[in-house]
Amino acid sequence: MEVDIRRVALKHALANAVKFGGKARVDSVVSKVFAEVPEARKAAKEVVELVKEVVEEVNSMSPESQASLLSELWPEALSGERKVEVKRLPPLPGAEEVGGKVVTRFAPNPDFVLHLGSARPAILNYYYAKKMYNGKFILRFEDTDPRTKRPMPEAYDLIREDLRWLGTPWDEEYIQSQRMEVYYEVAEALIKSGNAYVCTHSQDEIKAFRDAGKPDPCSFLPPEEHMERWEKMLSGEYPEGAAVLRIKTDPAHPNPSVRDWIAFRVLDTEKTPHPLTGDKYRVWPTYNFACAVDDHMLGVTHVLRGEEHAVNTLKQEYVYRHMGWKPPVSIHFGRMNLEGMVLSKSVIRRGIEKGLFSSIDDIRLGTLRALRRRGILPEAIWDLVLEVGIKPSTARVSVDKLHAFNRKYLEPRANRYMFVPEPAKVASIEGLEAPITAEVIVHPSFPERGRRRITFSKPEVYLPSDVASSMVRLMGLGNFEVVDGGSKLRYLNNDVSFAKKHELPIVQWAPVESSVRGRVLKAAGTKIEEISGYGEPSLAELPPGEQVQFVRLGFVRVEGPETYIFTHD
């Protein structure tokens, strides 16, 4: 009975450890044992002590070893999909007022590619417009700053590709640099109504006015004077920095940045031409002006963006007020800090310029292209974003959380393959006649996928260097006695029950004569580790982009011939 209880405890300890990141809990395992073997309660004290021993043994194993042993001995324990709870979003305020015809927008600046942080507003806005409500999702490129946030010509298409991969297709697309006449028309309406004026004072002069609590003297000039100044801005009579168009607000507003904020400025596009319009325009709207106009003109009903835009919302409300427009409902969510991943666009850009990172898809980065290259699935990013939701506080998320979501989707998809990392040792096989044939399970949870046959004539295999047991089971080949310090393997039998009875470690291997030399690239902080090794022959048949699991190593994505990108364990 003790042997049976120990095996039951081992099964549940492994399952518990695999489910919860490599650490099984005694109380959870005890309850599972008693549920499966009720009569064990008669010897509860002894059973608890036995479970403690088993849990200690299991927790000393690596997560890869735990999963490997569980899949070999009790594959049914892995057949159920891992459940990772994902919270859903609350309804939008004001959605009923528009009859559920919610219109949202995702408005990236095409000065760089998207990263995990920018995926959050894309998913949230898409989810509300298309999943929760029968609405419209707009993609709007905000590219009206050709000097300080100069657009990358290739970023427009790269962002489109990222959004398609992410699963957030858009209903309509707009590019702000193509809508300049719309902004000019609204600007002139504001000037004529006395709600905007052209200011020719320097920054120092403006600061002095504000420090003294005085309004800008330019604001007292009649609209006709400001229309003349506006025409001079458009005609090029004012050089860069000589004049700006300001929106009238509250000169005594407690936030100085809100006081008569700048709506348009002159930029010398002969020196810094726009990648789409060249030097056609010299007078460019600021973010807040173009954003306010477009949100109204495009019928946006709800604006979901980061809490850093709270002040921008205050500024934009003045445009709505002056024009007699109804503002959209604004919702500000907190930042999402993903620990262990580089997300800052400026840091990434500088790193690439200095040669610290190879490209925008360097596997150490948090760009969507880098995550895709690593094998992170868009479904996992969705789950992470929906889990964090729209709460206003800053969310600190571990990269392990993203991996847990990804594992949920990847585990049933990824077939299992054998890969022996270096340093590997060569062992000769005794007791089997050539040619030797092994049948390896493609996926332990899906027996209908069948087995792969590995046939080789030379009785030599690569083994992991940490093989130390007196007996082992080579996956799909059989049970062996380890002799001469591991340089020889003496065939015993191919009886799975024998392996279970003797609790043999399950070992991955590769035939020496037909193994595939390979390397696994793994992001490790600011470095990239390279794990070289030997894989089974069928690895050569995997196409680029295929995602598989290397037994005892982790999930990988095929990069190309003999190169694999490590995803996570």
Curated annotation (Swiss-Prot):
GO cellular component, one term: cytosol
CDD domains, per database record: GluRS_non_core (cd09287)
Catalytic activity: tRNA(Glu) + L-glutamate + ATP = L-glutamyl-tRNA(Glu) + AMP + diphosphate
Pfam families found in the cross-reference section: tRNA-synt_1c, tRNA-synt_1c_C, tRNA-synt_1c_C2
Keyword DNA repair recorded: no
InterPro entries assigned to the protein according to its UniProt record, in alphabetical order: Gln/Glu-tRNA_Ligase, Glu-tRNA-synth_arc/euk, Glu/Gln-tRNA-synth, Glu/Gln-tRNA-synth_Ib_cat-dom, Glu/Gln-tRNA-synth_Ib_codon-bd, Rbsml_bL25/Gln-tRNA_synth_N, Ribosomal_bL25/Gln-tRNA_synth, Rossmann-like_a/b/a_fold
EC numbers on record: 6.1.1.17
GO molecular function terms noted in the UniProt entry: ATP binding; glutamate-tRNA ligase activity
UniProt-listed Gene3D superfamilies: 2.40.240.100, HUPs (3.40.50.620), Ribosomal Protein L25, Chain P (2.40.240.10)
Top EC class for this record: ligase
Chief location of this protein within or outside the cell: cytoplasm
Example GO biological process: glutamyl-tRNA aminoacylation
Domain of life: Archaea
Keywords: Aminoacyl-tRNA synthetase, ATP-binding, Cytoplasm, Ligase, Nucleotide-binding, Protein biosynthesis
Motif 'HIGH' region: where in chain: 108-118
Family of this protein: Belongs to the class-I aminoacyl-tRNA synthetase family. Glutamate--tRNA ligase type 2 subfamily.
NCBIfam families: gltX_arch, PRK04156.1
Protein name: Glutamate--tRNA ligase
